[in-house]
């Protein structure tokens, strides 16, 4: 039903990407800013979220790895992803000012919360530290807002986790044209800290991946998407977000440059090693139509793919 579709989707998605000229490898830094509201305080600490994003072997409350661990595994050790966590800072207005639903059900002012977060952050950091590819843009700004996310069934006044693009602004001589955000707490009741799945999905956008589910449902046709097999689809919620799925092979190969692709040109018997650990385990079969091809990989229940 529509409610289920809404729970499985992220609104305000940015499907456009800045051009990439190099593989997403090496040391990368992201800026994570914790924001409470005038009427909703943060219950977790900066240290709590530093652990969720950065701690190797993170195991708080049943977790099976941190955001750092996730990107280390899915990149086959090629990406070392560190998040600098700042805050929490207090927003000027109550939660409903930012998260109430406006036209089409979209949140009315989450961009204002982002601007307030940046005003606090630039007093403490140098934005040039967050431009790994040297293109003059801040690579990744992620907001963690107090309380729950609307996508988990929280109040309509809550913010829905998303990534958004906007006309670029300039701060400290650096351009910023996107941000992402997820909630402090998981679900819609209780005090459990958020899981890494939604964070990995939204940060996947910042690195250059698109959504792989039907973002407009039946408008212009329907698309079943990559489902639980892909963090950029329903797979961000695998095992309640504890063990989000790997990226699909197209993203790994062509967006991020993490895997090698072997094009098969002759009939024969071929073997595929599990792609969880084998970075050159993808085959390509061209169909004969320009730009149309299949990618083949072997997926097993292992590592962050354990909940497939």
Stretches found by the model and what they are:
Residues 68-70, 140-142, 146-307:
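Extracellular hydrolytic enzyme modules, especially secreted metalloproteases
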Residues 1-180, 276-308:
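Zymogen propeptides/activation segments of proteases
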């Amino acid at each position: 039903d529509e409610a289920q579709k809404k729970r499985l989707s992220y609104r305000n998605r940015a499907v456009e990407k800045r051009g990439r000229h190099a593989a997403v490898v090496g040391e990368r830094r992201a800026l994570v800013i914790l924001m409470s509201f005038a009427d909703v305080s943060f219950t977790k600490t900066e240290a709590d979220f530093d652990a969720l994003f950065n701690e190797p072997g993170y195991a708080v409350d049943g977790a099976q790895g941190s955001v750092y661990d996730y990107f280390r595994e899915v990149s086959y050790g090629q990406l070392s992803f560190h998040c600098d966590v700042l805050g929490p800072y207090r927003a000027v207005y109550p939660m409903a000012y930012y998260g109430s639903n406006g036209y089409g059900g979209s949140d009315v002012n989450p961009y204002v919360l982002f601007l307030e977060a940046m005003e606090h952050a630039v007093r403490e950091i140098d934005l040039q530290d967050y431009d790994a590819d040297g293109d003059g843009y801040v690579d990744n700004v992620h907001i963690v807002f107090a309380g729950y996310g609307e996508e988990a069934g929280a109040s309509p006044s809550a913010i829905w986790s998303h990534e958004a693009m906007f006309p670029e602004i300039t701060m400290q001589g650096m351009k910023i044209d996107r941000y992402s955000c997820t909630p402090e707490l998981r679900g819609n009741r209780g005090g459990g800290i958020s899981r890494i799945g939604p964070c990995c999905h939204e940060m996947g956008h910042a690195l250059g991946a698109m959504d792989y589910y039907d973002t407009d449902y039946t408008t212009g046709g329907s698309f079943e998407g990559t489902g639980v097999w892909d963090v950029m689809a329903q797979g961000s919620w695998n095992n309640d977000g504890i063990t989000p799925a790997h990226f699909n092979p197209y993203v790994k190969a062509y967006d991020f440059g993490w895997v090698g692709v072997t094009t098969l040109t002759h009939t024969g018997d071929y073997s595929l090693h599990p792609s969880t650990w084998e970075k050159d385990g993808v085959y390509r079969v061209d169909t004969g139509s320009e730009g149309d091809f299949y990618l083949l990989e072997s997926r097993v229940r292992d590592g962050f793919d354990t909940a497939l």
